[in-house]
């Protein structure tokens, strides 16, 4: 039997009239739908059971045949086939048109496909199709020309003159006849010859025509099929009609549109039978043409057909388009069974891989499993009985439910699903109530809080789905974020606060200086009240023999606090003792200074290093570092345990600490009043100078803003110096649990300057703080900023979501396809430094997790640090940086040779697992999510670099990222040099308000004009290279690629993307930006086709271009030449090889029109196109190499036991046998 789900590709084409008839199960002749009294479909109508199949399963319309046993019989009385009613979703009908009509997509699209084939302008076409003019089809021996347009009067005149010696017609029939006459081969040859001489607009049009004629020739579609003689009628269940209460009917708009077509068609038939006058027939034909236009794409031409309440009717095109269309609503995202949603609540007692599911919800979700188990155990006699027990919620079902949910993970998802960590698997635990329970550490990945957030739950049903959920999606595996490889499960709030308080030290606490032989002894002393968590004590290192204490310290006494001793009990036994929050202590034994020297008194040691302990409680960032380090050393299982222990410890310690906030905890500032008085004095001074005309209004404004900003900074400085380890607010802020210095300043100092609705700053600051309370005016001023903040956030979310969608669409088919593409190319990695922003990304960051492409040697000694083809880990990268190496050749995604994807060696390490990436990993989607997800954290504004002459508006944040990936002309564009050379002179031309920079190259000299106000970025005598900036600003990648090469442009885009993210505090891995940059530069534009069959100016994939050239070179011809072509992500997503993916993205009708004319073949390589047609996606476990592995079971018992040598000989013999066959 054929596997319906196994096909290589999917093709689209134009349907010929005969093809439409072959799909059809019968002609729809009447506009009737269903009989309003009997509610039965009318005969020959739009819902006819004879055409479309029975409305009831296995029952004909008249009731003569009922039941499965009559399957396949056609009733002799009513003519309905006995089969399932499901066929009403599949069977099509057709309408035989009395006159041909054009298909609006091919006539009205831009460019008009019919117009190009016939070489007639769209305006003229419209006149002919809608019966405003005649077109000459065959001029005969008259003086007329073919395709000449004649008005009614001219036609009569010519007819009187020449009689029947020429043929001219109107309407779609004329267009059909002309299209039939087109000889594609002849036209293509003629056009190719013409192209040699044509220039400008004519050449562009000729290339367009050639492209479309070539498409028809190669696809096997005939041009006349763009004119329809029959209209297909889609299955009735896809355009349903349902009865509402009160006897009225709700129907799909398509039925109304079909009825219009049928009515007009029937009227036209009648008029033709009656031999009505030509004018009346023409009018009816025009109305039929308009009815079919409205059916296919209502509103494309003229005013749309409206239904009740002046609402435009939804045509077939509208059914496909947009978010509510068939593609995005029903094919890419479906509603699924075995799912639920509820409010979430926190549950600190859960393990990291667990979630709480309310009992009633679990019972409903796992109902079939519970029913089966009830029957299996004999608690219920059959399934019906089991269902009844569940509905009644009998006592004996709960044990069965507990048993059933063991080993069956569920998926939890929170919208918006910004990245793959927004869906994770958990093992369900039954909980009372109605809320889903979530582990506190899972919140970060979901960006969830418990102020009313809701989450959806899904049950994986098949064994494969369960296995994937457990092995790949379980929350315990998602410790690192794919964005940059850092832990995403960093503790927050109470957990941070508790562990910070636990690891604090205090001089002079009870029991200070006590020495304990083992940690257990210290615990007894704590329980007896002899010591406190913050007490500094001594402990014998010998009590923890598995730890690495460093040379000679195995039997020493070390100084620590009891709290830190307890904290260290969370770590594995063989991990270092962490006594101070430093990177050194995480990677090597504790510093020597904490050990007692022989004979040294512990009190002396405390006097010496006590302050070091006091100054170093463990903050939030350090807790994250410990998770990272434990993950690197011990992997998933142990890290998951550590996280749960850390959570328990944090909650327990913050409970014991009893930290709370009161008004009294907000400190008073001593200097604020004096600082404010001084600022007011300075403001008065500035105003005075302005009144005397010594300052412009802008200078006055800027000065006042600066005075108040300085004042607020001084107040903030005083508050920042307030570090009281006993003050709860201070402890919360310093530990990283909640709040930052700015919040603290607003509580205790002053709020400072506020923004106006336009984004400027008010000159009057808010002097009060929240402890004192604001005046009415101050409160009013604050509201502008608050509202603007809310609006900005809402806008940013939408912008960022749309960016993510475009990124995913362009990168979704980038999958790791092979182990090594074998390229010897790579990129030179060096630190990314910006003139203004300083260091953007260090060399170390760029090396970790990448493969070397050349051997790396020490610049001083010349010894090999790392050989070629090695995956660099943190230690190796640090070693390279420490050796003083400035540049390293690495394998890169930008230079990978794998087609339709990337190889493992060019990608390097998978950031989410810290291992080398696996074949099948969907790295494109991950890259798109990693760039899109932090989009909401970037700013939305275009900053104006204040008052500097010549400084343009520089775009930053989200708009800048969009500008780069969409390849738009950047704001504040920099002029770049097109030659290598020296800056000869810089001159100002005051008369023309210009400056001129002369660059002297080796071959020619170039003069660049720049604005008079711009400040040149070069000086006379500077040596510069192609692509270097002459004035500050953003380089346009399209210009850069013309003067340099693809790789330089890609590296520029990469550096700029990193600048946008890292300056906003978002660490993004290079490889994600590389994946998308590669996608934007996948195409080339053909300059000279040589002896290939490519068209000049055609834009095509680099891989396809190489293949076409290879074929020509092999046969000894002249290859084509092309230049790199940069496409924005939207364009690139629409230009993809998959028409399904492009059509479901944007401009659905345009994509489908083009694809059908070209007879496009979708190779189904990406993810979206496979989701659309319901196939398993070709990534991850859906990769053919994983799917096609069939576990072999040897059923035959061996006659005797073979040795290895026997087996090898047997296999050799079998191979020879098959070869001889």
UniProtKB/Swiss-Prot annotation:
It catalyses: RNA(n) + a ribonucleoside 5'-triphosphate = RNA(n+1) + diphosphate. SMART domains: RPOLA_N (SM00663). One of its GO terms (molecular function) is zinc ion binding. Binds 1 Mg(2+) ion per subunit. Zn(2+) 1 binds at residues 60, 62, 75, 78. Its cofactor is Mg(2+); Zn(2+). The keyword ATP-binding does not apply. Keywords: DNA-directed RNA polymerase, Magnesium, Metal-binding, Nucleotidyltransferase, Transcription, Transferase, Zinc. The RNAP catalytic core consists of 2 alpha, 1 beta, 1 beta' and 1 omega subunit. When a sigma factor is associated with the core the holoenzyme is formed, which can initiate transcription. NCBIfam families: rpoC_TIGR. HAMAP family: RNApol_bact_RpoC (MF_01322). This is DNA-directed RNA polymerase subunit beta'. It comes from Lactobacillus delbrueckii subsp. bulgaricus (strain ATCC BAA-365 / Lb-18). The lineage of its organism: Bacteria, Bacillati, Bacillota, Bacilli, Lactobacillales. The gene is rpoC.
């Amino acid at each position: 039997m054929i596997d319906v789900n196994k096909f290589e590709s999917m093709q689209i084409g134009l349907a010929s009239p005969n093809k439409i008839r072959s799909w059809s199960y019968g002609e729809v002749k009447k506009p009737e739908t269903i009989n309003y009294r009997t509610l039965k479909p009318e005969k020959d109508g739009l819902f006819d059971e004879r055409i479309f199949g029975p409305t009831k399963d296995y029952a004909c319309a008249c009731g003569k045949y009922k039941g499965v046993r009559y399957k396949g019989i056609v009733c002799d009385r009513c003519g309905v086939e006995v089969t399932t009613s499901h066929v009403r979703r599949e069977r099509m009908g057709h309408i035989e048109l009395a006159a041909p009509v054009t298909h609006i997509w091919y006539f009205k699209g831009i460019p008009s496909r019919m117009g190009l084939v016939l070489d007639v302008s769209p305006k003229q076409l419209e006149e002919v199709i809608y019966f405003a003019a005649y077109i000459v089809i065959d001029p005969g021996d008259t003086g007329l020309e073919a395709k000449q347009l004649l008005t009614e009067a001219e036609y009569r005149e010519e007819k009187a003159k020449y009689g029947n010696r020429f043929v001219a017609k109107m309407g779609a029939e004329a267009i059909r006849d002309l299209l039939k006459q087109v000889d594609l081969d002849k036209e293509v040859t003629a056009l190719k010859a013409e192209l040699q001489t044509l220039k400008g607009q004519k050449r562009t049009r000729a290339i367009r025509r050639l492209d479309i004629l070539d498409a028809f020739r190669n696809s096997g579609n005939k041009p006349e099929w763009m004119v329809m003689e029959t209209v297909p009628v889609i299955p009735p269940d896809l355009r349903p009609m349902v009865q509402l209460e009160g006897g009225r009917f709700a129907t799909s708009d398509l039925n109304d549109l079909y009825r219009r077509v049928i009515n007009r068609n029937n009227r036209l038939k009648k008029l033709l039978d009656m031999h009505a006058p030509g004018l009346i027939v023409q009018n009816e034909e025009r109305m039929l043409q308009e009815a079919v236009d409205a059916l296919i794409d209502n509103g494309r031409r003229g005013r749309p057909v409206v239904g009740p309440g002046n609402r435009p009717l939804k045509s077939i095109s509208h059914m496909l388009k947009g978010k509510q269309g068939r593609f995005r609503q029903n094919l890419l995202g479906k509603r699924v069974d075995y799912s639920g949603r509820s409010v979430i609540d926190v549950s600190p007692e859960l393990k990291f891989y667990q979630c709480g599911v309310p009992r009633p919800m679990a019972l409903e979700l796992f109902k079939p499993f519970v029913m089966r188990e009830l029957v299996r155990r004999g608690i219920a006699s059959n399934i019906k009985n089991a269902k009844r027990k569940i509905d009644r919620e009998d006592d004996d079902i709960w044990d069965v439910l507990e048993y059933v949910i063991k080993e069956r993970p569920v998926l939890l998802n929170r919208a918006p699903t910004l990245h793959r960590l927004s869906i994770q698997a958990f093992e369900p635990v039954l909980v009372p109530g109605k809320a889903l329970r979530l582990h506190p550490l899972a919140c970060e990945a979901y960006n969830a809080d418990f102020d009313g957030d809701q989450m959806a739950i899904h049950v994986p049903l098949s064994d494969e789905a369960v296995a994937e959920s457990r092995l790949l999606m379980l929350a315990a595996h998602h410790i690192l974020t794919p964005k940059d490889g850092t832990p995403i499960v960093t503790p927050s709030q109470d957990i941070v606060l508790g562990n910070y308080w636990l690891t604090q030290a205090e001089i002079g606490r009870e029991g200070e200086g006590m020495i304990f032989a083992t940690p257990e002894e210290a615990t007894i002393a704590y329980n007896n009240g002899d010591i406190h968590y913050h007490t500094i004590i001594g402990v014998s290192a010998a009590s923890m023999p598995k730890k690495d204490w460093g040379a000679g310290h195995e039997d020493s006494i070390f100084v620590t606090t009891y709290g830190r001793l307890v904290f260290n009990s969370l770590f594995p036994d063989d991990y270092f003792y962490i006594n101070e929050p430093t990177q050194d202590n995480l990677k090597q034994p504790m510093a020597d200074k904490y050990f007692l020297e022989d004979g040294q008194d512990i009190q002396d040691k405390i006097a010496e290093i006590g302050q070091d302990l006091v100054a170093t409680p463990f903050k939030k960032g350090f807790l994250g570092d410990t998770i990272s380090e434990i993950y690197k050393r011990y992997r998933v299982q142990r890290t998951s345990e550590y996280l749960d222990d850390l959570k328990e410890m944090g909650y327990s310690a913050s409970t014991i600490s009893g930290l709370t906030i009161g008004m009294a905890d907000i400190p008073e500032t001593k200097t604020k009043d004096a600082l404010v008085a001084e600022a007011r004095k300075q403001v008065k001074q500035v105003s005075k100078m302005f009144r005397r005309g010594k300052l412009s209004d802008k200078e006055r404004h800027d000065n006042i803003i600066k005075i108040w900003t300085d004042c607020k900074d001084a107040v903030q400085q005083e508050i920042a110096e307030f570090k009281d380890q006993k003050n709860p607010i201070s402890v919360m802020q310093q530990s990283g649990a909640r709040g930052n210095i700015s919040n603290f300043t607003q509580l205790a100092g002053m709020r400072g300057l506020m923004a106006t609705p336009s984004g400027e700053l008010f000159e009057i600051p808010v002097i009060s703080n929240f402890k004192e309370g604001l005046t009415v005016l101050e409160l009013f001023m604050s509201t502008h900023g608050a509202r603007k903040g809310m609006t900005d956030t809402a806008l940013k979310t939408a912008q960022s979501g749309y960016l993510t969608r475009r990124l995913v669409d362009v990168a979704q088919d980038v999958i790791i396809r092979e182990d090594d593409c074998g390229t010897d190319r790579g990129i030179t990695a060096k630190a990314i430094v910006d003139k203004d922003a300083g260091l953007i990304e260090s060399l170390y960051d760029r090396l970790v997790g990448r493969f070397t492409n050349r051997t790396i040697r020490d610049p001083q000694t010349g010894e090999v640090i790392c050989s070629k083809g090695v995956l660099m880990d943190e230690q190796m990268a640090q070693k390279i940086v420490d050796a003083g190496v400035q540049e390293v050749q690495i394998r890169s995604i930008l230079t990978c040779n794998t087609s339709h994807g990337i190889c493992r060696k060019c990608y390097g390490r998978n950031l989410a697992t810290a291992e080398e990436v696996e074949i099948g990993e969907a790295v494109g989607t991950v890259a798109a999510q990693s760039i899109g997800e932090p989009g909401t954290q970037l700013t939305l504004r275009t900053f104006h670099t204040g008052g500097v002459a010549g400084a343009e508006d520089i775009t930053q944040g989200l708009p800048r990222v969009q500008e780069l990936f969409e390849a738009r002309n950047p704001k504040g564009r920099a002029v770049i040099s097109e030659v290598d050379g020296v800056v000869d002179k810089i001159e100002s031309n005051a008369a023309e308000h210009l400056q001129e920079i002369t660059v002297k190259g080796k071959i020619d000299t170039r003069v660049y004009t720049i604005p008079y106000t711009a400040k040149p970025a070069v000086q006379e005598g500077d040596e510069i290279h192609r692509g270097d900036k002459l004035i500050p600003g953003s380089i346009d990648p399209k210009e850069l690629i013309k003067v340099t090469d693809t790789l330089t442009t890609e590296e520029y885009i990469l550096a700029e993307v990193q600048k946008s993210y890292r300056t906003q505090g978002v660490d993004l891995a290079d490889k994600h930006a590389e994946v998308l940059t590669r996608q934007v530069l996948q195409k080339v534009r053909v300059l000279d086709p040589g002896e290939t069959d490519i068209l000049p100016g055609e834009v095509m994939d680099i891989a396809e271009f190489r293949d076409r050239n290879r074929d020509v070179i092999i046969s000894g011809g002249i290859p084509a030449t092309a230049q790199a072509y940069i496409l924005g992500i939207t364009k690139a997503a629409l230009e993809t090889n998959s028409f399904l993916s492009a059509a479901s993205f944007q401009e659905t009708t345009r994509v489908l029109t083009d694809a059908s004319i070209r007879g496009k073949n979708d190779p189904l390589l990406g993810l979206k196109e496979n989701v659309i047609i319901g196939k398993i996606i070709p990534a991850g476990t859906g990769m053919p190499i994983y799917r096609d592995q069939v576990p072999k079971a040897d059923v035959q018992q061996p006659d005797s036991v073979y040795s290895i040598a026997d087996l090898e000989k047997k296999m050799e013999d079998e191979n020879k046998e098959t070869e001889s066959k």
